[in-house]
Amino acid sequence: MKKTFSFTVLILFVIPLLVTGLMDSMPQRHPVEGWCKRPLPNQKPGPCNNDRCSARCKEQKQFEFKGGKAMGICSSENRCLCTFRCR
């Protein structure tokens, strides 16, 4: 009984240390790493519309990436910014 108890305590103590050590050694990536944001090149003056901005970003060939298309969002300065995969 005593050996089983000490073995269990040892396992419960060693496994979390191993897992923590393995997790620390893995490279951590920032969630937005590899994504770029550029202004829409041919934006007309006037207020920015999110739906139109997103549609125009998806139409731009320069913002296409493998497996998807760009997303557009209006900035606080009424500029359309296209977010796309740049790596």
From Swiss-Prot:
> What parts of the sequence cross the membrane?
none
In terms of one coarse class, where is the protein primarily found?
secreted
Could you tell me which Pfam families the record lists for this protein? SLR1-BP
Q: Which UniProt keywords apply?
A: Antimicrobial, Disulfide bond, Fungicide, Plant defense, Secreted, Signal
Subcellular location per UniProt equals: Secreted
Q: Which InterPro entries match?
A: DEFL
Which range is the signal sequence, renumbered to this chain?
1-21
Q: Which cysteines are joined by disulfide bonds?
A: 36-86, 48-74, 53-80, 57-82
**Cellular component terms per the entry's GO annotation:** extracellular region
Domain of life assignment? Eukaryota
- GO process terms (BP): defense response to fungus; killing of cells of another organism
Q: Its family?
A: Belongs to the DEFL family.
Stated name of the protein: Putative defensin-like protein 169
Organism, by scientific name, is: Arabidopsis thaliana (Mouse-ear cress)
Q: What is the lineage of its organism?
A: Eukaryota, Viridiplantae, Streptophyta, Embryophyta, Tracheophyta
